[in-house]
Each structure stands twice: as C-alpha cells, then as structure tokens.
C-alpha cells in the first residue's frame, strides 16, 4: 500500500497538467495560462492508422528471345554506271554591233599664208678619213700533247643470288549471291487527260509608224575675209664705224745680263774597292727515304636489288568546259581632232656689236724698281 501511495504521488507530481491546475486553484487570481487551459481545451487530433505500404509485385523475368543469326551475304558488285554525256550548251546568238553615228564634217578654217623665212645654210665640214689600223697576224694555238689512256681495273664478279619463290595462295572463289524474288510493281492508275482550254485569239494590233522628221539644213558658215599680206620687214643696216689705228709699243733697249763667274772644278775622289766575301761551301740536303706505295683495297660491289614498281593508276580525263563566246564591245565614234593654227615666229632684230679695243702692251719691269 505504501508503495502504491508513493507511486501515485510521484505520478501526480510528475504530470505537468496537475501541477498547473493545483497552482491555478491555490492562487486567488487565475493566471492567463490556467484560464486558457481550463476554458479552451485543445481538441486531440486522432491518429490515423498506418496504412501498409504498397508493394509493387515483381514481374517474372521473361527470357530474351535470341535473334536468329542471318547468314552473311557477300556484297554484290555494283554495276558500272555508263557515262552520261554532258549536254551541249546552246550557242549564244551574236549581238549585232551598233552602227556608228556619223558626225558631220566640220570645215577647217583656212589660215592666211605668211611669207617663208629662208633658213641660213650651214658651212659644210670636210670629211675626215678614218686611219687604217694595221692587221694583227693570227697566233696559232699550240697543240696539247695527247695523254695515254689508263686501263680501268676489272671488278671481281659476284655470283647471282636467286630470288626465293613465294608460296602460291589458292584463289578465293566468290560466293554466289542468291537471287531474290522479283516482286511485281503495282501499276499506277491512269489519270485521264484533261483537255487544255483554247485561248481566244487576240486581234493583231497594227504597229504605229513613227512620223518622219524633216531634215534640218545645216547653216552655211560665213566666209572669212582674206587678210592682207604682211609686208617684208627689211633688216636695218648697221652704221660703219671708223677704223681705230693700232698703237705701236715704244721700243725698250735690251738690257745685257751679267755673266756669272765659273766655279772651279772639284778633284775626283778615288774609288774604294769593296772587300770580297769568302764563299761558303754548299751543304747538300739529305735525301729522304722513299715510302713504298700501299695499294688501296678494292671494295666488293653489292648487287643491285630491283625496286618494286608502284601500280600505275589510270589518268582520269578532265571534262572540257564549253567555251563562252566573247561579246565584242561596241566601238565609240571617234571625235575629229581640231588642229590649232600655228602662230608664225617674228624674227628678233640683231643688235650691232661693239668693236673690241686692242689691249695695251705690257712693258717689261726694270730691275731695281718697286
């Protein structure tokens, strides 16, 4: 019994709801928490029973159907497609050249003729004969001496190495391709031909003729009046100047040069003979011993192995492109060149040249004067 009382007291004290209720009853003013608990008790949400999990039923494993192995068919050889000739392009029609428009002839203006001025003739220079060069005698080339022919050494012959025969492989016969059953193609239904409606014929429209334009007459140019001829301009004659007599230089007396005294001749120095050097005896050079020539060993020649020739591929001819005809360019009409009138040159009058006065002769300087 004692144990039961202890367990009940312990259970009451351990529950938080009973403790809150006791505190609310003992206290004079009710607390907000106690009021809420007493007035608005929360409804308990009923727990739904746990539904068993839906297990997906396992499907039985079906054995995979094995595909039957198809026999390997050898690849059929494709038939050779015949070469399709290229269609020739139609020739472009030649475009006619446009006719050149003829320009009216422009009459040239006639210029007045001026008198011709004669050109002064140059004096002829005498011809200078070319000096003849002496002939050089031909020098004969010396003939080179003929060298004796050196016989070539014979190489040792090697035996030929026979090529090993390659084993022959049997030819693989190609398997015959089984003939497939020919399936008849279904015939297409015939479509009835629909007759084309005939178009109504249009009346021919007469071409309008262009009205003829009256020819316009060219106005005649008025004739230029003839210019009077220019009178010849006479060259003015130069006035003759009086001759100026040449001044004769006064004769200066000749001054004799003083004779220099002769220097006495110096006596000749006697010749000093050079002492002769004693002759040194000639030292003979020692002769070196001759080294015997060692013959070079001849190398054996390796037989040439023929190279395998690469297979030649047939050349594929390039297709020729059709030539496009050249379209000629229309030529433009040439405009006539208008020549400019040449202006005559007026000769300049020559000025009279002044005569040169003769230079005065220079007098010789007298020694002793500044």
From Swiss-Prot:
Ranges for region 52 X 5 AA tandem repeat of P-[DEGQ]-[AEFLIV]-[QPT]-K: 43-365
UniProt keyword annotations, A-Z: Cell wall, Developmental protein, Repeat, Secreted, Signal
InterPro entries xref list: PELPK1_2
Chain positions covered by the region annotation Disordered: 65-370
Sequence repeat start and end residues: 43-47, 49-53, 54-58, 60-64, 65-69, 71-75, 76-80, 82-86, 87-91, 93-97, 98-102, 104-108, 109-113, 115-119, 120-124, 126-130, 131-135, 137-141, 142-146, 148-152, 153-157, 159-163, 164-168, 175-179, 186-190, 192-196, 197-201, 203-207, 214-218, 219-223, 225-229, 231-235, 236-240, 242-246, 247-251, 253-257, 258-262, 264-268, 270-274, 275-279, 281-285, 286-290, 292-296, 303-307, 314-318, 319-323, 325-329, 330-334, 336-340, 344-348, 355-359, 361-365
GO cellular component: extracellular region; plant-type cell wall
Gene Ontology process terms (BP): positive regulation of seed germination; post-embryonic development; regulation of photoperiodism, flowering
Annotated signal peptide: 1-34
Subcellular localization, as worded in the UniProt entry: Secreted, Cell wall
Basic and acidic residues biased stretches: 65-223, 232-262, 271-296, 306-334
Phenotype seen when the gene is deleted: Slower germination and root growth, delayed growth and flowering.
Annotated function: Positive regulator of germination and plant growth.
Protein name as annotated: Protein PELPK1
Organism for this UniProt entry: Arabidopsis thaliana (Mouse-ear cress)
Lineage summary: Eukaryota, Viridiplantae, Streptophyta, Embryophyta, Tracheophyta
């Amino acid at each position: 019994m004692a144990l039961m009382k202890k367990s009940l007291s312990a259970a009451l004290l351990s529950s938080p709801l009973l403790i809150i209720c006791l505190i609310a009853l003992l206290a004079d003013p009710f607390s907000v928490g106690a009021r809420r608990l007493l007035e608005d008790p929360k409804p308990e949400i009923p727990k739904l029973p746990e539904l068993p999990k839906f297990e997906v039923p396992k499907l039985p494993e079906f054995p995979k159907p094995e595909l039957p192995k198809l026999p390997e068919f050898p690849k059929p050889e494709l038939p050779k497609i015949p070469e399709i000739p290229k269609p020739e392009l139609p020739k472009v029609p030649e475009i006619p050249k446009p006719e050149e428009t003829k320009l009216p002839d422009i009459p040239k203006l006639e210029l007045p003729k001026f008198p011709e001025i004669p050109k002064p003739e140059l004096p002829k220079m005498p011809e200078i004969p070319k000096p003849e060069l002496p002939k050089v005698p031909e020098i004969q080339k010396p003939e080179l001496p003929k060298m004796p022919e050196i016989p070539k050494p014979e190489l040792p012959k090697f035996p030929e190495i026979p090529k090993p025969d390659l084993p022959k492989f049997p030819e693989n016969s190609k398997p015959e391709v089984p003939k497939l059953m020919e399936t008849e193609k279904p015939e297409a239904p015939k479509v009835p031909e629909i007759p084309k409606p005939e178009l109504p014929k249009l009346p021919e429209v007469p071409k309008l003729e262009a009205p003829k334009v009256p020819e316009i007459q060219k106005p005649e140019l008025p004739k230029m009046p003839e210019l009077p001829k220019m009178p010849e301009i006479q060259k003015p004659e130069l006035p003759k100047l009086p001759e100026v007599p040449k001044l004769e230089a006064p004769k200066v007396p000749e001054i004799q040069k003083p004779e220099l005294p002769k220097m006495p001749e110096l006596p000749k120095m006697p010749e000093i003979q050079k002492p002769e050097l004693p002759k040194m005896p000639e030292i003979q050079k020692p002769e070196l011993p001759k080294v015997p020539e060692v013959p070079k060993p001849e190398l054996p020649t390796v037989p040439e192995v023929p190279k395998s020739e690469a297979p030649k591929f047939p050349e594929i001819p390039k297709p020729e492109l059709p030539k496009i005809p050249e379209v000629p360019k229309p030529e433009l009409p040439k405009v006539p060149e208008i020549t400019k009138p040449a202006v005559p040159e007026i000769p300049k009058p020559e000025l009279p040249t002044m005569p040169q006065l003769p230079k005065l002769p220079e007098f010789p300087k007298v020694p002793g004067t500044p």
